[in-house]
Amino acid sequence: RYRVDHLLEEQSEEVLSTISKILDIDSKEELITKIVSNLINKQNNSGDIMIESGIIDPQTKEVGDWTNIRQFNLMFKTNIGPVDDSSSIAYLRPETAQGIFVNFQNVQATSRQKLPFGIAQIGKAFRNEITTGNFIFRTREFEQMEMEFFCKPDSTKEWLEFWCEERMKWFHSLGISKEKLRLRPHGEDELAHYSSACYDIEYKFDFGWSELEGIADRGTFDLDQHMNASNKKLTYFDQINNEHFVPAVVEASAGVDRSLLTILADAFTQEEVNGESRTVLKLSPKIAPIKVAVFPLMNKNNMPEISQKIVDDIRNSGIASFYDAGGSIGKRYRRQDEAGTPFGITVDHDTLEDNTVTLRDRDTMKQERISIDKIIDILNKKL
């Protein structure tokens, strides 16, 4: 079973051209969205149209024996309490945003905020996905982080542009390759019913360009809907202009799991060094869980004791460090390369003579001699 839009994204231009002709679609703009819309309108014979068009099954690599399109409710349905009847039906939240909207006025009043301001939270969300896949990219239970930024209705355009820029900067700050990130505007046919404008931050995975975060102008839709259902005002009083109004919202919504997958996929590197394969996780030093590993070259001649003292001093300075004394020094380097540790410090025979150690860079594998008493200062500069 496939989501139609995802299935079409994996088709060749020739196949898309064929189905466009069958459905009498002239424009190539937002082509997949238009094809999906047309297939839904021709729901009763959509399977035949897909077969006639030569839509390929990604698993078999052959034209699929397609059924007619069906629409699904992606919300998780459940029952509260011991009695399983219509009165106990509930749905797991598909997004974290609605809790923010319900509590908007409470947060605004108790924290004495003035517009514009944002409320952010992180938590579990659930979607009954038609098909899961690509490891943790698409799952039915996931961690979501969302920010609802409340502002005057006539200022949403400028704030949408502002948050698009800020969110792109955030992904860049994680060390993710800039050439593999893009900001894609939604076409009119793609927009959600509550949104007047939306942008997706996308990353180019091995399986193609896919969404990491959506930034949308939700207008006053959500607060309006909650007011209609509850008969309670969710308005803001502007003391300067002496007026009440419903704030508009610019939303930034990202999946934590997808962000983590992006960081790992972007950092994972396999390269050949001196005829040997090397696997390295090129994490940005600022997000690497361990910043530096310390190795005694040998487990004798006071090298372990000196190494442990260096580790303790580094930890006491607030830098995450790791002590590794097992195996050859080459294997220890490789272990830390795979774990994404940016720097390695080796205590060797010269250390016993001149109180210096070797500092190794993970990415370049270059080494330099530095004095033990300058280790922390040098690490702070590099990090």
Model segments located where?
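NTP/phosphate- and nucleic-acid-binding module
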Residues: 1-383
